[in-house]
Swiss-Prot record:
GO BP annotations listed: defense response; neuropeptide signaling pathway
Family classification: Belongs to the gastrin/cholecystokinin family.
Cell compartments where the protein resides: Secreted
Keywords assigned: Amidation, Amphibian defense peptide, Hormone, Neuropeptide, Pyrrolidone carboxylic acid, Secreted, Signal
Protein name: Prolevitide
Transmembrane segments: none
An example Gene Ontology molecular-function term: hormone activity
Amino acid sequence: MYKGIFLCVLFAVICANSLAKPSSDADEDNDEVERYVRGWASKIGQTLGKIAKVGLQGLMQPKREAMLRSAEAQGMIGTLTSKRIKQG
């Protein structure tokens, strides 16, 4: 009886051990593809980030200049700076 249980457990351990290890051929191919895709994805992400940063700066700069010009035209810059000088 114990011999049968021992053989059953031994067989289960051997099967589980061999199933846990993937074949080396398939694993190497997957790793190579993952590295290739991961490399391209990070480069694309960095490039898109730089483009977005430059684009946002280009969009925001004219708005700032327009706001400053309108504030100067309305005479608000002098009042705003004088209030800051008095507070400081």
